[in-house]
Amino acid sequence: RYIAVSWARDVYKRQELIDIMDLGCRINHKPHELSGGEKQRVAIARSLVNSPALILADEPTGNLDEDTSKHVLNYLFQAIHNFSKSIILVTHSKYVANYCNKKYDLINGILV
């Protein structure tokens, strides 16, 4: 029973991420057939599928258009808030940084 419940939950989580990242129409495509933004969304979904307590993200919206970036960031930070997750995020975008509750700058190799 426990394994079946766990498996069903995993399938649901995978499908939820496929839907959120708008990847349903690309599910059977090979990696080399995906655009840069689609590959980025796959990477984000893969990082979330096991519900990690800590997410490390380096330029998570780097290859995404503005609308997709907003959608992904809203989902990511909603999940962090709702499920008590933490994220360490590196970005050059002030827009993306504004989603974070603590911000640090790296100046000459020193965090300030």
Language-model region placement:
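Single conserved hydrophobic/aromatic residue that forms the stacking wall/gate
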Residues: 1-8, 12
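Conserved catalytic loops of ABC-family nucleotide-binding domains
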Residues: 75-89, 97
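Conserved ABC ATPase signature
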Residues: 30-34, 38
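Catalytic Walker B motif of ABC-type/P-loop ATPase nucleotide-binding domains
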Residues: 55-58
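Hydrophobic anchor residue at the start of the ABC signature
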Residues: 44
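A short, proline-enriched helix->beta-strand linker immediately N-terminal to the Walker B motif
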Residues: 49-53
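Signature (C-motif/LSGGQ) region and adjacent switch/coupling loops
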Residues: 19, 27-30
